[in-house]
Amino acid sequence: MVTTAPHRDDREVMRDEAVMRPRILAALAEGPRTVPEIAAAIGAPAHETVFWVMAMRRYGWLAEIKGSETDGFFQYQTTGRTV
């Protein structure tokens, strides 16, 4: 179960990435979103969501939309990668 404690260890947050990936992909199925928008959609804190989004970006699950900044945040979209 994912907790929302403000001071979870970074390693603990990263272990949740595999669990959160389907929820993030489902949130982005509706269209591109920023990290705060993704966090709100999945019910997780933004400071943890940024870890998961960056990991998913690194491994080809997500891509930022170049030149589209909303309130200083890039929007992210799915890449269509499948397992």
Language-model region placement:
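Short, cationic-aromatic polyanion-contact patches
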Residues: 5-20, 64-83
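Metal-centered catalytic cores of metalloenzymes
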Residues: 14, 25, 50-51
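Hydrophobic residues on short alpha-helical segments
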Residues: 21-28
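Short capping segments at the starts of secondary-structure elements
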Residues: 29-34
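A short acidic, leucine-rich amphipathic alpha-helix
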Residues: 37-42
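Short amphipathic alpha-helical interaction segments
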Residues: 44-55
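Glycine-centered, phosphate/nucleic-acid-interacting loop/turn motifs that mediate DNA/RNA or nucleotide
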Residues: 60
